[in-house]
């Protein structure tokens, strides 16, 4: 699921523009001059309107703090073009890193390509000589897997709808504990074994403990944004590696196709579970749990920047380390550092509102299934690099098209259908057409 974070308030555009600037960027001219007093503000406004009438031009700063609701023509498009491309790139980087971690592990660590077990959600084996029976078993495994995903998603939405925040947090914390401690222990042990690196158990356990403890703090409490993003990428890669190892080959491809269809239905249907989850969060003005969503931008507020009270006109609270960064409390409510504005003369009762920085949110499930597709392409069959790179490029193309549609429709969209469809088409076409062609050229020593 792919969503776009944007400010809903149009009463004070000054906050939206300054929240996207650096901490040391100067305040716009209209903001500084318009707060001097009622007489100065009126004189400034009259002088500016006369100047604009004489020049025949429109001052864009007049819309910043003039109290006029709405934006000047073209400002919304300018902000979308300026900051939209940046966040697209910021989303490409983590997706690429997650897939690189998975492919590098598949190519180097044999543990994740050895088939010595299956998930309990895929009980039907594919070790049968009959193609029809193998296809039937893969379809049955897919039906069971998708049913489990649907039931758990609906269960999560019901819990969220009835505000069972503590239960959801406990559920997510237990999942994170298993990923950050158990799966990390297995992963690190296999990597050390592959590269023949000796390490005693106390050191290994201490390393896993430090890694997991820091991850739990960053994901479920507060920490640097970059560190939180790195942990979300890592747990997505670990989960993808588990699916690659324990999902049967044919079942994995059928599940990828089915999950993209389910994602389409769950997000776009009026009563789809993911759509209901997003709409409920928007109605309550609450963030979706950070353990489920990767965000290219956190909820940065004006209180986090190094403001100059003399130039900004703001009264900040004394420094408190616990309020340095925005975080989420134990009930999922946003917790912001407070910045108080003194009442502006000439604007009774008007206060600057904290705005959310524009950004793109991508569900961790999308990271996982992107990596499963690329990892399966690297692990199954010939494991040809051409096939792996083709799937990688297909996923990025699909993600780019999804982001383009997101900019057009400006609502939550499923991120799996286009990318997974392109990935499956590129995989089977490359594996069955391009790879034999390249092998034939290589056998005849012909190079293009």
UniProtKB/Swiss-Prot annotation:
Gene3D superfamilies: Presenilin (1.10.472.100). Isoform 1 is seen in the placenta, skeletal muscle and heart while isoform 2 is seen in the heart, brain, placenta, liver, skeletal muscle and kidney. Changing residue 366 to A: Reduces production of amyloid-beta in APP processing and of NICD in NOTCH1 processing. Increased mitochondrion-endoplasmic reticulum membrane tethering resulting in increased calcium transfer to mitochondria. Residues 109-138, 188-200, 245-249, 383-388 are lumenal. Pfam families: Presenilin. Changing residue 122 to R: In AD4; increased mitochondrion-endoplasmic reticulum membrane tethering resulting in increased calcium transfer to mitochondria. GO terms for biological process: amyloid precursor protein catabolic process; amyloid-beta formation; calcium ion homeostasis; intracellular signal transduction; membrane protein ectodomain proteolysis; mitochondrion-endoplasmic reticulum membrane tethering; Notch receptor processing; Notch signaling pathway. Changing residue 126 to K: In AD4; uncertain significance. Probable catalytic subunit of the gamma-secretase complex, an endoprotease complex that catalyzes the intramembrane cleavage of integral membrane proteins such as Notch receptors and APP (amyloid-beta precursor protein). Requires the other members of the gamma-secretase complex to have a protease activity. May play a role in intracellular signaling and gene expression or in linking chromatin to the nuclear membrane. May function in the cytoplasmic partitioning of proteins. It is linked to Alzheimer disease 4: A familial early-onset form of Alzheimer disease. Alzheimer disease is a neurodegenerative disorder characterized by progressive dementia, loss of cognitive abilities, and deposition of fibrillar amyloid proteins as intraneuronal neurofibrillary tangles, extracellular amyloid plaques and vascular amyloid deposits. The major constituents of these plaques are neurotoxic amyloid-beta protein 40 and amyloid-beta protein 42, that are produced by the proteolysis of the transmembrane APP protein. This is Presenilin-2. The lineage of its organism: Eukaryota, Metazoa, Chordata, Craniata, Vertebrata. The gene is PSEN2.
